[in-house]
Amino acid sequence: MIPVYAQEHDFSSCRVLAVDDIPLNLVLVKKMLSRFNFQMETASGGQEALDSIARSKPDLILLDLMMPGIDGFEVIRRLRANPDTADIRIVILTALTSGEDVSKGFNMGANDYIMKPIIMERLLTSVVTQLSMVQSAKAQ
């Protein structure tokens, strides 16, 4: 069931990219967010995410940190260093729970940090908040 506050928004013009190297995590995130009408894509790693972003810039990225090759921290660093992608909203979804990791994520430019296992209400609240900010910025 989608909370009332989430039902009040039309996110049909928004693009969301979920990035995780574990396919089941991508399936779960897609299922949790399936009632929203935004366009959702997935990537199975950092390089695939960067390639997808280069083709079509998303409004929001749901990003795992621990991935082989290019990890989530490096994805954030590259996105924030590029003026064309520096404004993309990023929500970290990770099993890394130390205060150091949380601080590092925010210091690198993440907009929110959600620890796994993901609680659906927490994810919905974050997605609604981030996409509402995107829509407000586009309206100005």
Regions found by a protein language model. Give the residues of each.
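Charged docking surfaces used in two-component/phosphorelay signaling
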Residues: 27-35
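Short, glycine/charged-rich "phosphate-handling" switch motifs in NTP-dependent
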Residues: 111
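Receiver (REC) domain active-site loop signature in two-component systems and cognate sites
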Residues: 67
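Acidic, metal-coordinating helix/loop segments flanking the phosphotransfer/catalytic sites
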Residues: 42-60
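A Lys-centered signature of the CheY-like receiver
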Residues: 116-117
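Non-catalytic signal-transmission and effector/linker regions of two-component phosphorelay proteins
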Residues: 1-15, 30, 121-140
